[in-house]
């Protein structure tokens, strides 16, 4: 790892829970969201702070973790293991939590905040420490389930005109072929994908096969999050490539999935796999199989979005990610700097760490809970 030799100490931590209203109603096969509860972890050391965002939800709909469970684990287990300690690098912070199983999203909050803290201590951009070299990354948009086909086409048109380089439609049983057909007829040449969020079973293979007609880049996570065998069987029955999201929580999962033929693309979400170090390992495994990765989103504020952008500078991020402009989601973000795409390209924030600054003044107005921890 580059830039070794500079130790850093974690002296204190803050847990902040904020509530941000979304600018629009976002519907997936999981349900409808009108706001986002945003748990933040802020690590302090030697006059510098590193910040990370938790992407778990109030209920265990995406993976097993919940906000309440993650915060309990931070308070009672993870923070006591690192506060007051000095570390050589963020991977050493992750190693301090190595005896505990699972809970990758909670673990990622600690590890990602440590990466930001270390990068700021060194005065180096996070992406550089991770091994990335891009100054901007390709981005697309993820569009929720709309009221009808025309509403879908109108929303797609709006984002195509803004220059986004990939359109992803959320689908579910009963709302799949119709919006895809309408979108493809209106936009024959766009890069189009769909995301099912595990809403189907192998019995729906015939229905999903109908999507082969519409030149999709991939179908994302059509089947159960823990079923690689059926994903592999589905991949044999349809032409459209499968992209795995929830099914891949580690580099080991990625190796199994790709070896089985359960998918040919991986949606890499840094929090889902436990942090940046494991994300790099997933990235490398996928690259060894010739499988591209792209960075998925979880309706993050600018804190999580900045982490995602820096991770996306690694070379095997070869498809547009979900890191679209923050202004799509929020009237006001939790950071001071705007994260705005131009013609489908998101500039990588410059400066040490994630390159963004927490807007403490605004954060105070949307904070629901706050606590401080010291060694």
From Swiss-Prot:
The entry's active site is 170, 269
Q: How does activity depend on temperature?
A: Optimum temperature is 60 degrees Celsius. Stable at 55 degrees Celsius. Retains 80% of activity at 70 degrees Celsius.
Q: Which domain of life is it from?
A: Bacteria
What use has been found for this protein in biotech?
Answer: Can be used in concert with an aminoacylase to produce enantiopure alpha-amino acids, a process that has potential industrial applications. Introduction of inter-subunit S-S bridges is a feasible and robust approach to increase the thermostability of the enzyme without losing catalytic efficiency as long as the active-site remains viable.
Q: Please describe, based on the UniProt annotation, the reported consequence of changing residue 100 to C.
A: Loss of activity
A Pfam family hit? MR_MLE_N
**Keywords on record:** Isomerase, Lyase, Magnesium, Metal-binding
Tell me yes or no: is Metal-binding among this UniProt entry's keywords. Answer: yes
Which GO biological-process labels does this protein carry? menaquinone biosynthetic process
**TM annotation in the entry:** none
Which is one GO molecular function term here? O-succinylbenzoate synthase activity
Q: What is the effect of changing residue 68 to C?
A: No change in activity
Q: Which cofactor does it need?
A: a divalent metal cation
What does the entry report about how pH modulates activity? Optimum pH is 8.0.
Q: Which family does it belong to?
A: Belongs to the mandelate racemase/muconate lactonizing enzyme family. MenC type 2 subfamily.
Subunit structure of this entry?
A: Homooctamer.
Record PANTHER family: O-SUCCINYLBENZOATE SYNTHASE (PTHR48073:SF5), O-SUCCINYLBENZOATE SYNTHASE-RELATED (PTHR48073)
Protein name per its UniProtKB record: N-succinylamino acid racemase
Q: Which organism is it from?
A: Deinococcus radiodurans (strain ATCC 13939 / DSM 20539 / JCM 16871 / CCUG 27074 / LMG 4051 / NBRC 15346 / NCIMB 9279 / VKM B-1422 / R1)
């Amino acid at each position: 790892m580059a830039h070794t030799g500079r130790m850093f100490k974690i002296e204190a931590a803050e847990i902040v829970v904020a509530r941000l209203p979304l600018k629009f109603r976002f519907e997936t096969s999981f349900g409808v969201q009108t706001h986002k509860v945003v748990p933040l972890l802020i690590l302090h050391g030697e006059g510098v702070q590193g910040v990370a965002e938790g992407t778990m939800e109030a209920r265990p709909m995406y993976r097993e973790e919940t906000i309440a469970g993650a915060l309990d684990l931070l308070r009672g287990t993870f923070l006591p293991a690192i506060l007051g300690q000095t570390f050589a690098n963020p991977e050493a912070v992750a190693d301090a939590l190595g005896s505990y199983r699972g809970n990758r999203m909670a673990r990622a909050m600690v590890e990602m905040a440590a990466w930001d803290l270390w990068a700021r201590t060194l005065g180096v951009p996070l992406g550089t420490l991770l091994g990335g070299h891009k100054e901007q990354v390709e981005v697309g948009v993820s569009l929720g389930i709309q009221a009808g086909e025309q509403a879908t086409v109108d929303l797609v048109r709006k984002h195509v005109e803004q220059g986004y380089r990939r359109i992803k439609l959320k689908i579910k049983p009963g709302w799949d072929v119709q919006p895809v057909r309408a979108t493809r007829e209106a936009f024959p040449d766009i890069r189009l994908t769909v995301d099912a969020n595990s809403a189907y079973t192998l019995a729906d293979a015939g229905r999903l096969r109908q999507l082969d007609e519409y030149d999709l880049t991939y179908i994302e996570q059509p089947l159960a999050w823990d079923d690689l065998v059926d994903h592999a069987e589905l991949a044999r029955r349809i032409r459209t490539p499968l992209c795995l999201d929830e099914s891949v929580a580690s580099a080991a999962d990625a190796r199994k999935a790709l070896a089985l033929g359960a998918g040919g693309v991986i949606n890499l979400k840094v929090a889902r796999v436990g942090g940046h170090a494991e994300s790099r390992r997933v990235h490398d495994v996928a690259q060894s199989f010739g499988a591209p990765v792209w960075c998925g989103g979880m309706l993050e504020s600018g804190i999580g979005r900045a982490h995602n952008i820096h991770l996306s500078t690694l070379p095997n991020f070869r498809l547009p990610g979900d890191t679209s402009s923050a202004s799509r989601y929020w009237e006001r973000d939790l950071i001071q700097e705007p994260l705005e795409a131009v013609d489908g390209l998101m500039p990588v924030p410059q400066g040490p760490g994630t390159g963004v600054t927490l807007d403490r003044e605004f954060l105070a107005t949307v904070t629901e809970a706050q606590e401080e921890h010291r060694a």
